[in-house]
C-alpha cells in the first residue's frame, strides 16, 4: 500500500495534472491525469518532474492549487497520508483510511527535508525569478514572498486545501491564539446518489503541545444505531464482526479471539446432530406467581417483551437429540432472555429433563449461562436450586448416570451454587466469567476491591473448581469421547429413526 505524503495539482490551460510526493519514491513524478490521458508527460514515467514540468520554458504552470473537487473526496482520502506543520513547527503525519474507518495522526520528521526541498526548488527556480508576479492571476503571496516564513506557507496550504476538500473549520492549523479547538468534518456517507450523510470526526488541537486527541461526535452514534443489525461489537477489543459470518465462526471475535455470547439455538445447532433435536416443554411459561410489583415495567409485560425479542418462551431450552450418534438429554440456558435468570419455569423444565434422562438412561448435558435466581419470583426461584439438586442426586448417585456441566460466560448466583457445579465432569469455556457473587456486589458489600481476573475461568481452573477448559471448536468431539469412555456409544445405523 503506497501512501502519498502531499498531493498537489498543477494546471496548464485545460489540462490538470495530479502529482504527489511519496516517501518510497526515488524521484518525484506525476501520478495520474485527471482530464486528458494522451499527454506525453503522463505517459513517460521516466522523466524527472523538474524536467517535465518545471524545466520546460514553453510551459506555463501556475502555483500549487487544490487537487480535486469535493465530490471526489471519498476517492481521494480513501487511503492517503500527508505531512502538515503547526504554528510551532511541529510536523505531523495525517493518515486517512475511510474504508477501514481509520484516522491517524503521528509525528514524523523523516520526510520533512524532502518536502521542503521540493517547495524551495520550485520557489527559487529561474522560471519563478524571471516572471512577473503581477501578471499571474493565480499569484499566491504565501507561496512566493520571502516575508512569509515556510511555516506560515505550509500552514496556509494545508488549511486551504483541507477546508476546500473536507470542510475544515477555519481555525485549524492557523496558529491563532484565539482558537484551540478545531473540527474536521468528513462527508463520507452517501446512499445511492441521495444526499450524503456526514460522519463527524472531532479533533482537538492544542497549539502549545504536539499531542492530539481524537473525539467521536454524536453523529457516530446515529450511524452505529442505523447499521447495528449488521454487526456485532466485541466486548473485549470493541472490534466489529459481521453478523452474517459470525455464526459460522462460532461467535468468536475475528480480531482478538474473544468468545462472544451465543444464543441457546446456536449452541443446540453446535452440539446436536442435524435433524435429531426434539424439544421438551416448549409451551411452559411463567404466570407471575407472586404478582411481583414493579414501578417500571410489570413482570408479565417484561416476559412478553423478551419472548418477542428472542423467540423463546423462557430462559432455557430443553430436549433430546444425538451428539455424533449418541442419544443425549440437553438443556441450554439463554442469557439473552432476562439474563438467563432461573425462575420457577426454568427450574421445572430442567428438573423434568433430568427426570426424563433418568428414566431413559441418557447422558445429560446442561449448558449454563445465567445471572442467578430470578428476583421477580422471590423464594420460588430459590427453591429451584434445591429441586434441581435433588433430581440430580437421584440421577447421579442412585442411577449412576453421567452428567456434564458446561459453564459459559457468565455463570453466577444460584446456578453456580447448584447444578452448575454438580457435574461429574465440569467444563468451562475460555475466559468465561464464573462466580457466585458478582464483582460489583462483592465490592459494594465488603467495601474491598476484587482483583482483576480472579473470577475468570483460567484462574479458577488452577484453583481446582472444574476439570477442563475446552474451546468451542473441539467441544463436540470432546463430549463424544467422554460419553464413550463412560459407556455411551452411538446408535447402530439401522436403529436410527
UniProtKB/Swiss-Prot annotation:
Q: Any idea where this protein resides?
A: Plastid, Chloroplast stroma
Q: Where are the zinc fingers (C4-type)?
A: 234-256
Q: Which GO terms describe its biological process?
A: fatty acid biosynthetic process; malonyl-CoA biosynthetic process
Domain of life according to the entry: Eukaryota
Read off the PROSITE patterns from this record: COA_CT_NTER
Domain CoA carboxyltransferase N-terminal span(s) in chain numbering = 230-497
Keyword Acyltransferase carried by entry: no
Pfam families for the chain: Carboxyl_trans
Which residues bind Zn(2+) per the record? 234, 237, 253, 256
Q: Name the top EC class.
A: transferase
Q: Which cofactor does it need?
A: Zn(2+)
Stated EC number for the protein is 2.1.3.15
Relate the assembly described in the record: Acetyl-CoA carboxylase is a heterohexamer composed of biotin carboxyl carrier protein, biotin carboxylase and 2 subunits each of ACCase subunit alpha and ACCase plastid-coded subunit beta (accD).
Annotated family: Belongs to the AccD/PCCB family.
Q: What is this protein called?
A: Acetyl-coenzyme A carboxylase carboxyl transferase subunit beta, chloroplastic
- The record lists the organism as Carica papaya (Papaya)
Gene from which the chain derives? accD
